[in-house]
Amino acid sequence: MLLHIPDILSADQVADFRRRLDAADWTDGRETVGHLGAQAKHNQQLPEGSPLRRELGEIILVALARHPLFFSAALPLKYLPPRFNRYSGGGTYGFHVDGAVMNLANGEQLRSDISCTLFLSAPYEYEGGELIISDTYGEHEVKLPAGDLIVYPSSSLHQVRPVTAGARVASFFWVQSMVRDDVQRRLLWEMDGSIERLRQTGGDAEAVLQLTGVYHNLLRRWSEV
């Protein structure tokens, strides 16, 4: 499921992030990938051990926990903590698929079900830099307002087009969902949204209760926790 979730961060939060990131020390993004990935990746990242990366990442995780649309769509179980990258001067990342299993700092592993990009640069601040996500329906071009999030299946082939002017700053992270199957997650998300709309419009209380029960029984059947 490809989903645009607006306003994860407020304008004030984005401005604070940018002020601090613009003054940060960045490293070559190729240091964080294997040999094949290094051939396609041309950007900068905050170092893995950066205190700033951890601090800003925690702010993002708190914001996500407060966002009902994100929870409904992702049904998150684990996160690979947010990282930060910057593309400028022709920086790009060619077509690739994210790794299936990632190592967490606590020694556990994460299955990458959902890939997330949180835009921290406004579209007018840079040229190029579109996130291109390829699936069975074709290619989708994504370039969102600062503070907005795009989520998509980690199995998707995707790339970042070259940034030919300005700088594209973003955070990116992965989620292991309670429901690994993307089709099942989408069905649950659609049902959850329908139940909420029925509640808001004064739908039949008994029918809403029954649908809510169906939702939770499907979640119980499909979830892995």
UniProtKB/Swiss-Prot annotation:
Single Gene Ontology MF annotation: L-ascorbic acid binding
Record key words, sorted: Dioxygenase, Iron, Metal-binding, Oxidoreductase, Vitamin C
Record-listed E.C. numbers: 1.14.11.-
A GO biological process held by the record: DNA damage response
Co-factor requirement: Fe(2+); L-ascorbate
Binding locations of Fe cation: H96, D98, H158
EC top class named in words: oxidoreductase
Cofactor note: Binds 1 Fe(2+) ion per subunit.
Ligand binding (2-oxoglutarate): R168
Residue ranges constituting the Fe2OG dioxygenase domain according to the UniProt record: 78-177
Origin: domain of life: Bacteria
Protein name: PKHD-type hydroxylase Smlt1146
The organism's taxonomic lineage, starting at the top: Bacteria, Pseudomonadati, Pseudomonadota, Gammaproteobacteria, Lysobacterales
